[in-house]
Amino acid sequence: MTKNINQPVAYPIFTFRWLAVHGLAIPTVFFLGGITAMQFIQR
């Protein structure tokens, strides 16, 4: 597979990786932010 690094791919691998990273990172940050907010609300 190392020989095909310079070859253009037929499928948008970078777009798929971007959607995968942001699709998981954004809800995770929002979820952690919500838990942190609830910790201050309870006190």
Swiss-Prot record:
Oligomeric form and interacting partners: Heterodimer of an alpha subunit and a beta subunit. PSII is composed of 1 copy each of membrane proteins PsbA, PsbB, PsbC, PsbD, PsbE, PsbF, PsbH, PsbI, PsbJ, PsbK, PsbL, PsbM, PsbT, PsbX, PsbY, PsbZ, Psb30/Ycf12, at least 3 peripheral proteins of the oxygen-evolving complex and a large number of cofactors. It forms dimeric complexes.
One annotated Gene Ontology cellular component of this protein: chloroplast thylakoid membrane
Domain of life: Eukaryota
Cofactor binding, per record: With its partner (PsbE) binds heme. PSII binds additional chlorophylls, carotenoids and specific lipids.
Record membrane topology: Single-pass membrane protein
GO biological process: photosynthetic electron transport chain
Name of the protein: Cytochrome b559 subunit beta
Residues the entry annotates as binding heme: H22
Location in or out of the cell: Plastid, Chloroplast thylakoid membrane
Organism: Thalassiosira pseudonana (Marine diatom)
Annotated TM spans: 18-34
Keyword annotations: Chloroplast, Electron transport, Heme, Iron, Membrane, Metal-binding, Photosynthesis, Photosystem II, Plastid, Thylakoid, Transmembrane, Transmembrane helix, Transport
Signal peptide location: none
Name of the coding gene: psbF
Cofactor(s) listed: heme b
Physiological role: This b-type cytochrome is tightly associated with the reaction center of photosystem II (PSII). PSII is a light-driven water:plastoquinone oxidoreductase that uses light energy to abstract electrons from H(2)O, generating O(2) and a proton gradient subsequently used for ATP formation. It consists of a core antenna complex that captures photons, and an electron transfer chain that converts photonic excitation into a charge separation.
Single Gene Ontology MF annotation: heme binding
